[in-house]
């Protein structure tokens, strides 16, 4: 069974374009995004690799690393990365897992039989404790949105640091702007206290169960 939200990322040793690596140990103390792609030398995957590389510094500023994966041999990865450098003048700096036997893909649930035998476009967001915090799947015909993946990483970090929840489209929510959601109270006393804080201007509330604040 593929790992689910809240599970620890499985311990695996992989072959990559940067040599052998042990996951999640290689990224100990960091967030990391593992993303799978269907195949090397394909147009949509090429646009994604360029997009990930162009935003790589933004990920690293969030203490987050990137690592790709597909069921291709490491030689294919290397030649494709060379092609991207030669033709598009983009140097791919993050490692790419060569899962030519499909072992890692099977372990992580990256092959969806109804969509073929290649890996789907999956995204695993893993925190510094090696806990899987988000999983996103895209079909082969749809490339990923870097803004959303970066937003998810940053939002999870803000949530962890402040004990809050993040609204839709944060930080540009239609109701609360760039504010964050205070988790609903779990007792009558806490609900009353919440409304008193709202009256005092410490927080804002639409109702006792829907309160938010700036951070």
Swiss-Prot record:
Residues 3-158 form the Thioredoxin domain. Its main location: cytoplasm. One of its GO terms (biological process) is response to oxidative stress. The keyword Lipid metabolism does not apply. It is found in: Cytoplasm. One of its GO terms (cellular component) is cytosol. Keywords: Antioxidant, Cytoplasm, Disulfide bond, Oxidoreductase, Peroxidase, Redox-active center. It is an enzyme of class 1 (oxidoreductase). Disulfide bonds join 205-211. The keyword Protein biosynthesis does not apply. InterPro entries: AhpC/TSA, Peroxiredoxin, Peroxiredoxin_AhpC-typ, Peroxiredoxin_C, Peroxiredoxin_TDXH, PRX_1cys, Thioredoxin-like_sf, Thioredoxin_domain. One of its GO terms (molecular function) is thioredoxin peroxidase activity. Substrate binds at residue 121. Thiol-specific peroxidase that catalyzes the reduction of hydrogen peroxide and organic hydroperoxides to water and alcohols, respectively. Plays a role in cell protection against oxidative stress by detoxifying peroxides. The active site is a conserved redox-active cysteine residue, the peroxidatic cysteine (C(P)), which makes the nucleophilic attack on the peroxide substrate. The peroxide oxidizes the C(P)-SH to cysteine sulfenic acid (C(P)-SOH), which then reacts with another cysteine residue, the resolving cysteine (C(R)), to form a disulfide bridge. The disulfide is subsequently reduced by an appropriate electron donor to complete the catalytic cycle. Homodecamer. Pentamer of dimers that assemble into a ring structure. This is Peroxiredoxin. It comes from Archaeoglobus fulgidus (strain ATCC 49558 / DSM 4304 / JCM 9628 / NBRC 100126 / VC-16).
């Amino acid at each position: 069974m593929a790992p689910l939200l809240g599970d620890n990322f499985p311990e695996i040793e992989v072959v990559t374009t940067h040599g052998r690596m042990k996951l999640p140990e290689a990224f100990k103390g960091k967030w990391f995004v593992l993303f799978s792609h269907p195949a090397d030398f394909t147009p949509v995957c090429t646009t994604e690799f360029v997009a990930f590389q162009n935003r790589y510094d933004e990920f690293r500023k969030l203490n987050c690393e990137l690592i790709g994966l597909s069921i291709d041999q490491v030689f294919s990865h290397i030649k494709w990365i060379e092609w991207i450098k030669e033709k598009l003048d983009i140097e791919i700096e993050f490692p790419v897992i060569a899962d030519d036997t499909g072992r890692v893909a099977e372990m992580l649930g990256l092959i969806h039989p109804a969509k073929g035998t290649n890996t789907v476009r999956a995204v695993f967001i893993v925190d510094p404790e090696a806990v899987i915090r988000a999983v996103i799947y895209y079909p082969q015909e749809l490339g990923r949105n870097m803004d959303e993946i970066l937003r998810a990483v940053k939002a999870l970090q803000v949530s962890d640091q402040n004990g809050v929840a993040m609204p839709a489209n944060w930080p540009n929510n239609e109701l609360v702007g760039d504010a964050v959601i205070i988790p609903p109270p779990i007792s009558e006393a806490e609900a009353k206290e919440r409304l008193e804080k709202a009256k005092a201007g410490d927080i804002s509330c639409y109702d006792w169960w829907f309160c938010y604040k700036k951070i």
